[in-house]
Amino acid sequence: GVADALVDFKFRVDAEIAAGKDKTKAIVDILREDIKTCKPIRFDGNGYSDEWVVEATKRGLDVEKSCPVIFERYLDESSIKMFESLGIMSKKELEARNEVKWETYTKKIQIEARVMGDLSMNHVIPIATHYQSMLVKNVLNMRSIYPAEKADKLSERNLKLIEEIAERTQTIERGVEELINARKVANKIESEHDKAIAYHDTVATKMEEIRYQIDKLELIVEDDLWTLPKYRELLFIR
């Protein structure tokens, strides 16, 4: 691991210094040597892209994305050995810290889920349906001016938006209900580890589904009606 590599690095640098070499030169020489050695396994592409996930998998690296599962690595035998050998933490201390990590993760997702439910039902859906009503009124006005067939042709875009808004708001409503139920189920789990896993696999996943629908509505509803900050506006908030 990284810790072992750092320990080995210090050991080699100390050996060079003991042999009479200047400290700075010893560090630079060892670094130069290590850079040459690791060149074949370095990845110079975008580490946030799917390309890296594929490449990392080929190299046998862990590509796990679930935080609660990743926390488990602290309790791997090699991890415990590293922490204990360096006098940082004992196995018991690592176990205690992991309990806190799992509990903290759960509480953060829990709070975010509650806020998302509130924003969805009390802000996003009312805003979207208000804009939908404006579109309906526009379509009705067009029908009062033109023959029905021509009016519907001229209002084709608005009719599509009216339908899309209805479908997306219904999906959000169902999603929020499912989100609440997922939280209720997860909250009954006593183990902090298992509860965190449940929050990641069910609650956080449902939040992503709801967010997708809200993001789509954000692109549909006109700016003056959308009271929440849009993504592009967040760039200019001080």
Where does each model-flagged region fall?
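C-terminal amphipathic alpha-helical interaction region
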Residues: E33-R238
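An acidic, glycine-/histidine-flanked metal-binding catalytic module
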Residues: G1-T24
